[in-house]
Amino acid sequence: MTSVAKPTPTSASAAPVSAPDQVGECSEARALAPDEQSVRVVTVAFNPGEELERFLASLATATARRLVVVIADNGTEHDVVTAAAQRHGARVVGDGTNLGYGAGANLAAADLEEDWIVVANPDLVWRPGSLDVLIDAGLANPAAGCLGPLLLNPDGTVYPSGRALPSLVKGAGHAVLGRIWPDNPFSAAYHTAGPGASGGTRTVGWLSGACLLLPAAAWRRLE
């Protein structure tokens, strides 16, 4: 996957993976009809280039639900972030300093009123309808505390965004062999490779922070 510091985008596609809910089943969003629900997308920007523009533009077709986009501006190029936000109807928050990723995301979510919240890196490019597929997966899996999409690298390969909780042996094997033998069995197990890794919905131990969807009720319980 492209990291947040690189300008080449990662694609968010429509094949969700989920992490078990550790705070109890959350059903507030499920009381509304799907087309009545709303979603807030939060992203943290630090002197972004064209990546933020692509991110915001792609969100226009990612969901048919009511969408609110909030950008936490942690950098110094405030005019660039503000201009991009104005072009795409987003809101910018920040105090002019670098709050850090977590604090920036929390600030952007501070007044959350929507039914769902997404925290995503600004170098993602959303495929049409992909956010709705992700939310639909959340509705179909009410015990999931957090969901993430299938992430594609710029070359179309799958980034292992849903991973297992490694044992000591598997973790050590992945750490030692991962770079010199990428397809080793320890890394494959850690990356939860195998059937279903590139499609459908599956349960994983943890999800990449590049793109996370949570029911608003689950987010509030974490505060």
Describe each model-derived feature in a short phrase:
Residues 53, 77-86:
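Acidic helix N-cap motif at the loop->helix transition within catalytic regions
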Residues 57-66:
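Short, acidic, metal-binding catalytic loop of nucleotide-sugar glycosyltransferases
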Residues 66-75, 93-95:
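Short beta-strand/loop segment that forms part of the nucleotide-sugar
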Residues 94-112:
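Glycine-rich, basic loop-to-helix element that forms the pyrophosphate-binding segment
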Residues 117:
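Short aromatic/hydrophobic "clamp" motif used to bind/position activated sugar donors
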Residues 127-161:
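Conserved donor NDP-sugar-binding/catalytic core segment of glycosyltransferases
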Residues 166-204:
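Short, flexible, basic/aromatic active-site loop/helix in glycosyltransferases
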Residues 193-223:
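Aromatic-glycine-rich donor-binding/catalytic loop that engages nucleotide-sugar donors
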